[in-house]
């Protein structure tokens, strides 16, 4: 308590320095240096006078302590916000917030959030005998589309990047086929993201090279993908890519002290392009009452 309070800049700190000044004599019993400590003030001031030769030395030491505290806070916050799990959480909430803010300009649009992980979604769709018996159909189809007075969903976004990895519990491309059935049954298009390495390329430059795209997607590795695209109900599933930047790197960000995000090469926070697609859909619906263009 004493260290933190002595290291603070402000009214109490200035009075502490005044009481240490030789011009004020040795009467230090009324010093308010440590709030609520009563007679302990004299002991504190005595120890400070014994340790520091001048007010300038004390002030310099206090400033160094404050800088050390700020460096420690910077390091701790960077450790938190650079963690993969925290970035996923932050990106999800920032993306959702951008949709809610866009909705503010469209009073006839409702945004509903279902707290369901991708793993729970996979289990729900893969373990049910038919789509109409799944939890998702109950929430999206039966309770809204198939209920008198219900409010059918116009579009559903899943904040998950589709992957072709074989290390997952379920084949994600097969789960995507089940999502196509769900979208068709509920008459609700579904938007997802695609992983950065889904098409074997990590940069966005190749998207405009049609010959390269045709060569990649026509290879044997993407036979399952081609079968998915050939399904009649595949029109109910869309992938939005690449990822989009939600915020830049924090530089001299004022949060009570100046916070700088490291490493310096950090490009900030990136999230699913599905949120951008949803905002565009809301804007189009607000413009003409239809989101099919």
For the regions a language model picked out, list residue spans one by one.
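A glycine- and small-residue-enriched flexible loop/hinge signal that marks low-structured segments
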Residues: 2-54, 81, 101-104, 115-116, ...
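Extended assembly-interface regions of large multimeric machines
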Residues: 52-56, 60-130
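Glycine-rich oxoanion-binding loops at beta->alpha junctions
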Residues: 131-140
């Amino acid at each position: 308590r004493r260290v933190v309070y002595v290291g603070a800049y402000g009214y109490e700190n200035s009075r502490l320095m005044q009481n240490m000044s030789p011009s004020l004599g040795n009467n230090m019993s009324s010093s308010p240096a440590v709030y609520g400590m009563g007679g302990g003030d004299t002991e504190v001031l005595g120890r400070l006078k014994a340790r520091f030769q001048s007010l300038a030395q004390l002030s310099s030491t206090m400033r160094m302590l404050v800088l050390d505290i700020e460096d420690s806070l910077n390091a701790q916050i960077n450790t938190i916000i650079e963690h993969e799990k925290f970035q996923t959480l932050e990106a999800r909430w920032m993306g959702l917030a951008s949709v809610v803010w866009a909705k503010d300009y469209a009073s006839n649009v409702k945004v509903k959030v279902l707290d369901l992980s991708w793993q729970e979604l996979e289990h729900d769709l893969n373990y049910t005998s038919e789509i109409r018996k799944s939890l998702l159909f109950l929430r999206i189809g039966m309770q809204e589309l198939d209920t008198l007075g219900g409010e059918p969903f116009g579009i559903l976004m899943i904040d998950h990047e589709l992957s072709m990895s074989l290390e997952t519990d379920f084949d994600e491309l097969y789960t995507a086929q089940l999502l196509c059935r769900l979208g068709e049954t509920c008459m609700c298009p579904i938007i997802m993201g695609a992983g950065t390495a889904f098409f074997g390329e990590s940069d966005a430059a190749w998207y405009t090279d049609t010959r390269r795209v045709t060569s990649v997607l026509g290879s044997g590795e993407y036979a399952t993908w081609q079968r998915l695209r050939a399904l009649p109900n595949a029109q109910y599933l869309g992938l939005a890519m690449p990822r989009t930047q939600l915020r830049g790197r924090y530089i001299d960000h004022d949060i009570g002290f100046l916070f700088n995000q490291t490493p310096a090469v950090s490009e900030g926070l990136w999230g699913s392009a599905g949120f951008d697609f949803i905002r565009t859909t809301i804007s189009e619906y607000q413009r003409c009452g239809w989101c099919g263009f």
